[in-house]
Design a protein with these regions (language model features):
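Hydrophobic h-region of N-terminal signal peptides that target proteins for export
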Residues: 17-26
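Feature recognizes metal-dependent phosphohydrolase scaffolds
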Residues: 26-376
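Sec-dependent signal peptide recognition
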Residues: 8-17
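N-terminal secretory signal peptides that target proteins for export/translocation
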Residues: 1-8
């Protein structure tokens, strides 16, 4: 620290600030469980006889054994998520490369703010007043990070789970791409978990990651989600692709399969194994990379990267912005619009190659011009 005190130029403080930030992050502790949970659930688990569902209602557990009806199971709400849920049989990992589609809507980093997400999707007629899919044959992409921070993680996951079914029936699609917070929670890094969920886990007699284990419906769903998704000439992922990792995009199917196989494994194990270490690297992996925004790459380097991958643009979350923003001549689009703060948020629209952002009041504007160095 003496070296920091002797620095005279403001820009020279940057390494020290990074050191302080790293110390602060590593020192963050898991919160104590909340004293009371008003409403949470359902948590639906696969059993030998079908499904079991559990809710926390007024800090008490409600259990239901759910009979199957053919291939599906219906879950009627008790508290928590307010809509009925149709549980489908587990699906194998879906294809993560699709042809171009005329209309794509994208959002990321919901972080437990279900109510805000619903307001945003309703404002742009992605869902109707009953929170059901109303975008026809269009596509919705959610670029990671439903877990952590906010108090409505469970509701957000079930909304996306149901919308995926409804969109498919209408000829559209909903895609969820894994973020770093999905990885963190499932390998038991609980530093950002809302205290509500630690209380829910306590009442249900499971660890929080076990509520999303391989025997849970949402846990199974998460384990079949990709870490990167290509639609036409647009790549969607949570963090970004570092120049040294272009082969991960070229071998996208193998990359996604490796991630999916590693979801829920202990952190030390995935970071030590040669085939997964760089996929979980805290600086350069697809779920953590921030190099498009901190000056590591200039526009010429970004252009070269996209040319090698035959892409028009890369759409990422992870790095928080005040608005959906464009960088490097519309080649990098940052869609983490700080929904995590629970106050505002925006959607990205890609319509026949034209880009715009949708605001909470239902209006549309051009993308904001991003500023290099703005990083969270």
């Amino acid at each position: 620290m003496p070296a920091c005190r002797t620095l005279r130029a403001m820009h020279a403080l940057f390494p020290c600030l990074l050191l302080l930030a790293a110390f602060t992050t590593s020192a963050r502790e898991v919160a104590a469980p909340a004293e009371h949970v008003d409403a949470d659930g359902p948590y639906v688990f696969v059993t030998a006889k079908g499904h079991e569902a559990a809710w926390i209602c007024n800090d008490h557990i409600v259990h239901r054994t759910l009979p199957a009806r053919g291939d599906t199971t219906q879950v009627v709400p008790e508290c928590g998520y307010p809509h009925p849920v149709t549980v489908l049989p587990p699906r194998t990992a879906e294809v993560a490369q699709y042809p171009a589609t005329p209309r794509i809507v994208a959002v990321s980093d919901i972080h437990g703010h279900y109510d805000l997400l619903v307001r945003l999707l309703r404002a742009h007629h992605v869902i109707d007043a009953r929170d059901e899919w109303s975008l026809g044959d269009a596509t919705l992409v959610v670029a990671g990070d439903v877990f952590d921070r906010g108090p409505q993680v469970t509701e957000a996951f079930w909304l996306l789970y149901g919308l995926q079914q409804q969109a498919r029936a209408a000829g559209g699609a909903v895609h969820f791409v894994l973020g770093n917070h999905e990885t963190m929670v499932l390998y038991d890094d609980l530093r950002y978990v809302n205290p509500k969920y630690l209380r829910s886990a306590q009442l249900l007699g499971r660890s929080y990651p076990a509520l999303y284990g391989p025997d849970s419906v949402i846990g199974q769903w998460l384990r079949t989600r990709p870490v990167m998704l290509r639609i036409g000439d647009t790549l969607f992922l949570h963090g970004g692709i570092a120049p040294e990792n272009l082969d991960l995009v070229r071998g996208m199917d193998a990359t996604n399969a490796t991630y999916q196989a590693a979801v829920g494994l202990p952190r030390d194990q995935v970071k030590a194994a040669p085939d997964t270490a760089r996929l979980f690297d805290g600086k350069t992996s697809p779920i953590w990379y921030r190099g498009y925004f901190d000056g590591q790459l200039d526009t010429a380097q970004v252009d070269a990267l996209l040319t090698q991958l035959d892409l028009a643009r890369i759409v990422v979350g992870h790095t928080s912005m005040p608005h959906v923003s464009t960088f490097h001549g519309d080649q990098i689009i940052a869609i983490d619009s700080s929904i995590k703060n629970g106050e505002n948020g925006e959607l990205l629209f890609i319509e026949d190659g034209l880009l715009s952002r949708g605001l909470l009041d239902g209006s549309r504007l051009p993308l904001a011009e991003g500023k290099i160095g703005l990083e969270d």
